[in-house]
Amino acid sequence: MLTLFLAKRRSLGVVLAASAALGAAPPPIEPLPRGAPDLAGALVQTHRDLFAGIEGWLKSAKPSPDPPPDVTLNALFEQRIYRSLARDDLLARATLARLPQPLGDAARDIVAAHRELFRITPPISARTIRTGRAEQAGALLSYYREAERRFHVSWRVLAAVNFVESAFNKLRSRSAAGAQGPMQFMPATWRAYGLGGDIHDPHDSILGAANYLHAAGAPRNLRRALHAYNPSPAYVDAVLRYARRIGADRRAYYELYSWQVFVRTPQGDRRVTGPGR
């Protein structure tokens, strides 16, 4: 099946359609389509295959702790498409206009969130990058729901914060300012709101974040609370966009969970997790 991806004289859109029909997912370094029509077609097909794979993963008798290979590969290809659109406004407009609903709305939110985070994320040295495995998606979901019950902060918002701050703890590096852990707390803030827990523990960090957001005004004034968490309107908008996507379709949580970590370095973007590096 992988020979389909090596056919030099066939368009990428045809290759993707054929591979999808045979149940294959794009390899990790599959070149992206260049034009808006092919890019839109690839995004539609990849998104469809990704969500079908997520459904199969969740419905299996014994779901694997990590995303299955097809989910991982489709999620990576989709993520690469979104990152390319976020960096090219003209291409993004032409591509997004060709997408059917509800994918069109989801893609607009995701591209906008990428741009917002690009603007506020400084480059970091590759030597400081540390990564690790995320805790199981189901376990994290139980922590978000526990925090929601206790502090009345939507689990979707907590999941979005966890994703934006550390890609669900796949990114283990401290921030330039010294923030640490899955929810990126400054040590002094953690002492005040961490409930005596471990700043690096996903469960404790999620509850601490919910405690802080509640004290800062959530759920009544969620924007103010998120701005207190990270004083950037772009950050607030990005978190709310991702939370909206998770709320619109439960599979979007597992979609984001299956994405890889890309970081900005002085030499450019670098993917630091996932297959084919």
Protein language model features and the residues they cover:
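Glycine- and aromatic-rich loop/turn segments at beta-sheet edges
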Residues: 170-178
